[in-house]
Amino acid sequence: QEAESIIALTPRGAGLKATDFSASRDLAMSGQLSQYRVLHFATHGLLNSERPELSGLVFSLIDQEGKPQDGFLRLHEIYNLQLNADLVVLSACETGLGKEIKGEGLIGLVRGFMYAGAPRVVASLWSVDDLATAELMKLFYQRMLKDGLPAGAALRAAQLEMSGQKRWASPYFWAGFVLHGEWARSVTPK
């Protein structure tokens, strides 16, 4: 549902939608993602705050024929991606956390995607609610892609809009996502 509402906002033919079996670790590592300016991952995040190299994203664990496959994209693999994305959105639980290393800062998924080439990453600070996250992301992309707001302003506008709705008024539903990196420039999807 989240992916469908976002892809509907992009220009026809401007995106790659990989869901279910097609959302694979192999696709993420294939280099194909380097063609796109915005990457949105709506999946499960794995956080290992003691051994951050074991953190990652979970893609399909079975292929179209029902055979098991490695669906775990680990942090060291993320560091080695070569991305041209203006923005990476990690729409999963605790994707903005990591391990604090003295003299280095926070080691986690955000740093991995920035090291891979993304100047800005939207990530979560806690275990987020699925329905609220889908609504927040829909509003975020509407503000960014339709209204032309920079990513930081679009996220703020989406969060303010949700905070004004009775159902989503609690900050638990909308405040968990933050933008890391360069916040002022607009993002152009491909």
Language-model regions: role of each:
Residues 1-190:
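Catalytic cores of enzymes
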